[in-house]
């Protein structure tokens, strides 16, 4: 997936970078910046990444544009990621993988069960994610690396929260975006 869209601030700052970084547009950027009036602070602003996309907003959309772009560039048809049983990153990954026709597998570790965790568990299923409960965080990380090496080397692996090189590019772009705003 070659990205010739030069409208993102990072690509304006670094011409030619867009041709080397795979990206699939998933969100509407830039997101607005709003001054918080309700707190007792003179100058506190918030970047509204919750408005980044209609399907599922939030900062993970920024990361997934580049992560899933790389998965597509590599010809991967399955994405595997990890998180707690209520992971918002996992939910965003499931939603956008389904939208792009990519299978999604979530390796999940325990966390307290709250109403939002229950909601996310239902939504993973709704969006077609395969969920594997692996128990503790150490067991999940072990399963992540063993699955990759031994059982499913053809999948695209994304560490917790979309924390990889490609995901970071989305946040770097947000910094350039914020500077312009």
Model-inferred region functions:
Residues 1-181:
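PLP-dependent amino-acid enzyme catalytic core
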């Amino acid at each position: 997936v070659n990205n010739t869209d030069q409208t993102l601030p990072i690509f304006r700052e670094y011409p030619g970078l867009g041709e080397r970084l795979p990206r699939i547009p998933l969100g509407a950027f830039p997101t607005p910046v709003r001054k918080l009036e309700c707190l007792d602070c003179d100058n506190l602003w918030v970047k509204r990444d919750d408005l980044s996309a209609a399907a599922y907003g939030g900062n993970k959309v920024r990361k997934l544009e580049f992560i899933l772009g790389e998965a597509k560039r590599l010809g991967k048809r399955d994405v595997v990621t990890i998180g707690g049983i209520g992971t918002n990153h996992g939910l965003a990954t499931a939603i956008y993988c389904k939208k792009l026709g990519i299978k999604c597998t979530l390796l999940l570790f325990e966390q307290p069960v709250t109403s939002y965790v229950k909601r996310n568990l239902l939504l993973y299923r709704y969006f077609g994610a395969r969920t594997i409960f692996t128990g503790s965080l150490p067991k999940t990380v072990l399963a992540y690396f063993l699955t990759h090496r031994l059982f499913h080397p053809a999948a695209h692996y994304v560490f917790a929260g979309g924390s990889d090189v490609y995901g970071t590019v989305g946040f770097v772009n947000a910094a350039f975006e914020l500077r312009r705003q």
